[in-house]
Amino acid sequence: MAVFVLVMILLAMAGHSSGTWCVCKEGLSEAMLQKTLDYACGAGADCGPIHQTGPCFNPNTVKSHCSYAVNSFFQKKGQSLGTCDFAGTATFSASDPSYTTCPFPASASGSGTTTPVTTTPSTRVPTTTNTRPYTITPSTGGGLGIPSGINPDYTDPSFGFKLQSPRFGFIVLFTLFLPFYLFS
């Protein structure tokens, strides 16, 4: 009995690192990713680290820079619903996309506080054309045919239905079942 209580206390106190990141989707054209990158940087993402002298410049690919920018925007907006959609070009990731020299923020406090860059963006000629309308606006939606921002292709199928901190789950279980063991 005492061992069970001790194990439950240790499990409740055990730390657990969890996070949610926003990354650009695979298989999209560079033109679409560039539009998403430009929007995120212009809308307040901290894009300093992906500039040429920044720690996240390499790998110097549009997808890599796009993922950093949309994640920065998502974290700055407090991981709010609809801030990781970007007209379908971005999605949630439960695995940390950080790499050696480039830590991706996992919260608003780690996403920097720089103001949007006002320099003229480089011009790129798209190699493909997209015939459907394309706009990049984060949506909160939810009414009369307007999308709610809930992305149907999350990579983590339990995303909306899991506890963000397993510690809370252990505390609840411990609190619920402790009286049964103490008074039985």
From Swiss-Prot:
Pfam family membership, one: X8
InterPro entries, per database record: X8, X8_dom_prot
Residue ranges the record assigns to the propeptide: 159-184
Signal peptide: 1-19
Stretches the record annotates as Disordered: 109-146
Subcellular location: Cell membrane; Cell junction, Plasmodesma
Name of the protein in question: PLASMODESMATA CALLOSE-BINDING PROTEIN 3
Record's keyword terms, sorted: Cell junction, Cell membrane, Disulfide bond, Glycoprotein, GPI-anchor, Lipoprotein, Membrane, Signal
PTM annotation, UniProt: Contains two additional disulfide bonds.
Main location as per UniProt: membrane
Membrane topology (UniProt): Lipid-anchor; GPI-anchor
Gene transcribed to yield this protein: PDCB3
Tissue specificity as recorded in UniProt: Expressed in the shoot apical region and in young leaves but also detected in the laminar and vasculature of mature leaves.
Stretches with biased composition (Low complexity): 113-139
GO cellular component, one term: plasmodesma
Lipidation (GPI-anchor amidated serine): S158
S-S pairs: C22-C84
GO molecular function: (1->3)-beta-D-glucan binding; polysaccharide binding
